[in-house]
Design a protein with these regions (language model features):
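Pocket-lining segment of extracytoplasmic ligand-binding domains
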Residues: 117-119, 193-301
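Short, glycine-/small- and polar/acidic-enriched structural segments
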Residues: 28-202, 218-224, 247
Length: 507
């Protein structure tokens, strides 16, 4: 009996201990926490009641980087325009990490961002998703980016077709895009991914140049102001720069598709504010870029600023309407830009497949620009700047003095046996050549007919010339200006190919 009493007492002691522990460890803290929470809520309510409504309707986290072409985003005028539209924009410099930038749009960390079109395509392929869409064009590189090399080691683009040539550049940058455009369009079968030497930043590319020798087969792919610095060396020349082609190095504003669906008005207000600032700075971009560079701790001299501004084509309102297909004009449509860039990235192995599955139209959204145009949004009187595809005509002596740039990569043109008649299959090839030539409007084209060494050499040369002229006629009939094309027969080498060499008239 006594032992049972001891057991029962022990059990009750355990129960009391458990209740005491629960009271001390759970109930008391929970009550204290509830009191603290109530006090915190009361404090927050007091703050709300004694504050004011925010002047900002929406906040946008905008991801970008320090590129000089983005200086308008950092300007006071843009901030003021946003404020007038009750928009608060937080600019986030991510150091040009495009993959993380797109992931940020995907997750909701960012609502809008700046991209180059090629970087958007590559990043979309990398993450396997299309979380962002293009809503406006910022600018196009028109000479700001260039490929330089020593004249002795690399006299022209054809000399790049050498496995010993190395491209010193920054990965996932406009420099890489420029290199891939050249790889895609010229006969550079010996250039591969192993030819690329990626470095961390522009300063490292420039350092590699400073340490190189005139005999080195290095190509330095960079942008201003470094290009100007390298070209001060008389042994270095500009192999090609972005003023020679169009539609490949293009900066755009993108919006998260999720944010666009939820708050299209905010995206519209952002675009209107930006385009108004483009108009505001239309005559003072040099001053803006200079102050922007100084603020960033990288001041530029007057010559560097002039070349930098000259090399960037900031797109105004009417140019955006044209590029985005809101109104008809000769400016290149953004859908064609996207398709051309995708083709370059695939053909050079930068991406394995098209993330848009052959539908470039799903990568841009032109409804906002269409709506603001229909509502007569024009910040001021702006000109739609165009570039003529018509080069000045040359006489025979001038044609003979053209500086060769390189030989275009074109599949073999096939003719009916023993004639100059182009086959239907090769007409498809020539149609593609027409489109390619439209993206290189600043170069003349020499069509070179080669001939067999067998049989009657003179007859072979005559056929080679007639074949070159037949190709010339086809190009002219499909929109290529007669002033930029010349058909010739070269001294026979045994081949019966027709070759296409670009060139320019030296100053």
């Amino acid at each position: 009996m006594k032992s049972k009493l001891i057991v029962v007492s022990f059990i009750w002691l355990v129960i009391l201990f458990v209740f005491a522990a629960a009271w001390k460890l759970w109930w008391v803290p929970s009550q204290e926490e509830a009191v603290e929470q109530a006090a915190q809520e009361a404090h927050e309510e007091a703050i709300r009641q004694t504050g004011s409504a925010s002047k900002y309707r929406t906040q946008i986290n905008f991801a970008y980087d320090s590129f000089s072409g983005y200086s308008i985003f950092r300007s006071e005028n843009f901030k003021n325009n946003l404020s007038q539209k009750s928009l608060k924009v937080n600019l986030v410099d991510d150091g040009a990490n495009y993959i993380e930038r797109l992931k940020g749009l995907q997750s909701g960390k960012y609502q809008m961002a700046a991209f180059t079109i090629d970087a958007l395509i590559k990043a979309s392929d990398e993450i396997g998703d299309l979380p962002a869409t293009i809503v406006e064009i910022i600018d196009e590189s028109r000479g700001c980016d260039a490929m330089t090399g020593y004249k002795l080691a690399i006299p022209d683009l054809d000399a790049l077709n050498d496995p010993e040539v190395k491209f010193i550049l920054i990965e996932n940058s406009p420099a890489e895009t420029l290199s891939r455009v050249v790889m895609s369009h010229f006969g550079l079968n010996n250039v591969s991914e192993k030819s690329f030497i990626p470095v961390a930043n522009a300063e490292e590319v420039y350092r590699r140049y400073r340490e190189s020798k005139p005999s080195d087969k290095f190509v330095f792919v960079l942008w201003e102001p470094y290009v100007t610095k390298m070209l001060e060396n008389p042994n270095v020349h500009d192999l090609v720069n972005s003023s020679r082609f169009r539609g490949y190095i293009v900066d755009v504003i993108v919006a998260s598709r999720d944010f666009l669906v939820k708050d299209e008005q905010a995206v519209r207000d952002f675009i209107e504010a930006y385009l108004s600032s483009v108009y505001h700075y239309r005559n003072t971009m040099e001053s803006l870029v200079a102050s922007d560079a100084k603020e960033a701790g990288t001041p530029l001299n007057d010559e560097q600023i002039k070349r930098l501004v000259k090399g960037i084509w900031w797109k105004n309102t009417v140019e955006n309407y044209a590029h985005m297909g809101v109104e008809s004009h000769s400016l290149q449509h953004i859908e064609d830009m996207i398709a051309n860039i995708t083709k370059v990235l695939i053909s050079t192995g930068s991406i394995s497949s098209d993330p848009a599955n052959g539908q470039p139209n799903i990568l841009y959204y032109n409804k906002i620009l269409s709506d603001i145009k229909n509502n007569n949004f024009f910040p001021g009187k702006e000109n739609l700047r165009t570039e003529s595809d018509v080069l000045p005509s040359l006489n025979d002596e001038e044609w003979s003095k053209l500086t060769p740039v390189g030989t275009l990569k074109v599949p073999k043109i096939v003719f009916a046996r023993g004639t100059s008649k182009v086959t239907s299959q090769s007409e498809i090839t020539l149609n593609e050549l027409v489109e390619k030539l439209k993206t290189w409007p600043q170069y003349y084209l020499v069509i070179k007919g080669d001939a067999s060494l067998r049989g009657d050499i003179e007859a072979n040369k005559a056929l080679a010339l007639e074949r070159a002229k037949s190709v010339e006629r086809y190009l002219l009939n499909h929109g290529i200006s007669s002033t930029r094309v010349k058909a010739v027969a070269v001294e026979p080498t045994g081949s019966t190919d027709v070759m296409f060499q670009l060139g320019y008239l030296p100053y």
